[in-house]
Amino acid sequence: MLFRSSVKPGDEIIVTNQEHEANTGVFRRLAADGIIVREWGVERDTGALNPSELDHLLSGRTKFLAVSHCSNIVAHINPIAQITTKARNVGALTIVDGVAFAPHGLPDVDALGADIYLFSLYKTFGPHQGVMAVRKPLTEKLGNEGHYFNAAQIHKRLVPAGPDHAQVAAARGVAEYFDALDTHHGGTHAQSRPERVRELLHGAEQPLLHRLLDYLKARKDVRLLGPSVARERAPTVSFVPHKITPAEVHLALGKRGIMSGAGHFYAVRLLDAMGVDPARGVVRLSFVHYTSPQEMTQLIEALDAILG
């Protein structure tokens, strides 16, 4: 593992229980090497991380902090710029999992201050390829994972198996898609394009998210997980039905032509912390900027029929 050589027994790292297991489990294993693993826990009722609690965990011994930009279950958008500043003040690195946020916010990695930011291109309308943005000075400290004679080539140092050329070439389509989206809506200046695209995504998603949250909040037979206010979250909405199982809701939606998910979504620690049985799981509904108002109406009408 890349970070194994940069920490020693007695050093500390911070993880959260809000994460997809991919951004916490691998770091927790360092405890076997004498690394002290501190957990930043969520609030039981909301699933949110309280930034003030982080102050009690950070110290001069903290080497790095792993945190999600937003959870794939509660979808609360964490104040990453504030979190990375706190970590940097004690000399700690930050590893941010942006998978659940990237499709909805076009993150400005520099402004966020993350040392490493990860997301999946297939979540951002591209090929099935992972992306890891690493601050250049950090690549020197991480060492070479590739062939020894490629050590001086930054784009090869962290790719031990070599690049998947077809996927890398296809990644360009993501940028082209956002360019086309901006142009379609009257954008002309490339320099300000990222911010305009963020506003376009936000403007399309928020009204629909507001409708769904209001609907679920009004029901007494479900538990909505995460913020009930649209502006505080990404449009990934999870809930626990009280009368039937998440799997039953998922199957019934599928029969009505509506895609959903049911399960723990690899966030077992989070569900445990919130008092939700991971084996039963949650219903998860996700949508993006091209979801239509008509589709949201179809979803709400279907939930009415299924939940009773």
Question: At which residue positions do the language-model features occur?
Answer:
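Pyridoxal 5′-phosphate
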Residues: 1-308
